[in-house]
Amino acid sequence: MAVKKYRPYTPSRRQMTTADFSGLTKKRPEKALTEALPKTGGRNNRGRITSRFIGGGHKRLYRIIDFKRRDKSGVNAKVAAIEYDPNRSARIALLHYADGEKRYILAPEGLTVGATVNAGPEAEPKLGNALPLRFVPVGAVVHALELVPGKGAQLARSAGTSVQVQGKESDYVIVRLPSGELRRVHSECYATIGAVGNAEHKNIVLGKAGRSRWLGRKPHQRGSAMNPVDHPHGGGEGRTGAGRVPVTPWGKPTKGLKTRRKRKTSDRFIVTRRK
């Protein structure tokens, strides 16, 4: 995928870039693999805002992605299409299995239409195949990594991300995460060979506020621009500092404060903390 630039015939076009979508092979999603995605506006089931600055945006269909792939062990699948997914930064691949079933997976970098992929302990460690970590060679790059066997992929799912296998010890495999963290993951956890595709996504420049609104993002209001009743940083004549350590609207310290719980159960799996 390449990044497309524009002539500056308006101020917003000067900086704006888009994906050229050249790698896509299908426009409409597979109807049986989609479902409605109602908008929340950042509200919970009581109608209260639990996530600020969310609302509006283009209507979307949710594409049902197979993050497990365990139940298709030993069944060959052919890549029928590479598609756009509005719900994530990565592209998705439509698989046609030999038993007649169709499923979506995250499209790794380099996967093409017509390629054959497989899953399971007997699968070869080649691009697009999903297999337990104990069968992945040291040094290999993987994505869609499980943290709990059978739970489904949780790590390295965004565009361009990957995890590298660093070593193996008894029932665990040491992997390097995109954050730089070295972590032990159970060897029965599944991962897919290769890095997630659409790596150029990080170079996209929105260029104007309207494109953020199309994505369902509302303007992020600064606390210092509010009144004292609305935020601890608010008030004052003209532009004034917060006058205290940066805090959230609810008075909790923020901007650099570590929020990870002390003595968390998963601490024993972390070999080296993220940088």
UniProtKB/Swiss-Prot annotation:
Residues 255-275 have a biased composition (Basic residues). One of its GO terms (molecular function) is RNA binding. Pfam families: Ribosomal_L2 (PF00181), Ribosomal_L2_C (PF03947). It comes from the Bacteria. Residues 1-20, 214-275 are annotated as: Disordered. InterPro entries: NA-bd_OB-fold (IPR012340), Rib_uL2_dom2 (IPR014722), Ribosomal_uL2 (IPR002171), Ribosomal_uL2_bac/org-type (IPR005880), Ribosomal_uL2_C (IPR022669), Ribosomal_uL2_CS (IPR022671), Ribosomal_uL2_dom3 (IPR014726), Ribosomal_uL2_RNA-bd_dom (IPR022666). Keywords: Ribonucleoprotein, Ribosomal protein, RNA-binding, rRNA-binding. The keyword Mitochondrion does not apply. One of its GO terms (biological process) is cytoplasmic translation. One of its GO terms (cellular component) is large ribosomal subunit. Part of the 50S ribosomal subunit. Forms a bridge to the 30S subunit in the 70S ribosome. Belongs to the universal ribosomal protein uL2 family. PANTHER family: LARGE RIBOSOMAL SUBUNIT PROTEIN UL2M, RIBOSOMAL PROTEIN L2. One of the primary rRNA binding proteins. Required for association of the 30S and 50S subunits to form the 70S ribosome, for tRNA binding and peptide bond formation. It has been suggested to have peptidyltransferase activity; this is somewhat controversial. Makes several contacts with the 16S rRNA in the 70S ribosome. This is Large ribosomal subunit protein uL2. It comes from Deinococcus radiodurans (strain ATCC 13939 / DSM 20539 / JCM 16871 / CCUG 27074 / LMG 4051 / NBRC 15346 / NCIMB 9279 / VKM B-1422 / R1). The gene is rplB.
